[in-house]
């Protein structure tokens, strides 16, 4: 049975943080340093999916820095405004272990983060096909702006969820 837990990122034990980072790194899109810093930022909530105490999926409700938000809004990236007032949070670090993909864990994690936003808007960026094509649209996120290439030459898309 899959159990879901929510933790404040600043209160997470080192072992849990390491497992969280490991799963995100398996997806390959985000530098470990950024994940560790992002999880420890004030207001960030970690969502964990566990089977028999083993973490098999993760996601986070993030509180993005203004410089990060401004970068995404720039014409070189999405070219779409994501104001702090309308979209105070970001859905991020969604990852599911390889052996449990296709079990609905990713969908449940995305929905849990939407619930944690408590009626506030969210944004997300992704290059992952399943996130772009089904998980985010299925949770009510809409693609906006233009796509752009990241440092690995993957095509990123900005999505917004309006409360």
Model-identified regions with their sequence ranges:
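Short amphipathic alpha-helix that is part of the acyltransferase structural core
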Residues: 1-37, 41, 46-56
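Short hydrophobic/aromatic beta-strand or adjacent loop that forms the aromatic wall/cage
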Residues: 44, 153-159
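Conserved acyl-donor/pantetheine-binding loop and adjacent beta-alpha core of acyl/acetyltransferases
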Residues: 48-50, 54-93, 101, 150-154
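Short, flexible beta-strand-to-coil junctions
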Residues: 50-53, 126-129, 162-163
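Short beta-strand-to-coil "C-cap" segments at the C-terminal boundary of structured domains/repeats
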Residues: 62, 160-163
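Conserved acetyl-CoA-binding loop-helix of GNAT-fold acetyltransferases
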Residues: 93-96, 102-115, 138
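Conserved GNAT acetyl-CoA-binding A-motif
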Residues: 115-129
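Conserved active-site alpha-helix within GNAT-family acetyltransferase domains
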Residues: 128-152
């Amino acid at each position: 049975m899959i159990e879901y837990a929510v933790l404040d990122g600043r209160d997470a034990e080192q072992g849990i943080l390491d497992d969280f980072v490991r799963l995100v790194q398996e997806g390959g899109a985000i530098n470990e340093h950024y994940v560790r810093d992002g999880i420890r930022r004030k207001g960030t909530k970690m969502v964990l999916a566990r089977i028999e105490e083993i973490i098999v999926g993760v996601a986070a409700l993030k509180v993005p820095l203004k410089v990060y938000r401004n970068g995404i809004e720039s014409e070189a990236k999405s070219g779409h405004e994501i104001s702090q007032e309308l979209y105070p949070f970001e859905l991020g670090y969604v990852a599911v272990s390889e052996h449990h993909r296709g079990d609905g864990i990713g969908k449940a994690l995305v929905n849990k983060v939407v619930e944690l936003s408590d009626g506030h808007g969210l944004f997300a960026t992704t290059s992952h096909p399943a996130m772009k094509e089904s998980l985010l649209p299925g949770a009510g996120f809409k693609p906006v702006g233009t796509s752009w290439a990241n440092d690995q030459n993957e095509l990123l898309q900005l999505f917004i969820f309006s409360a």
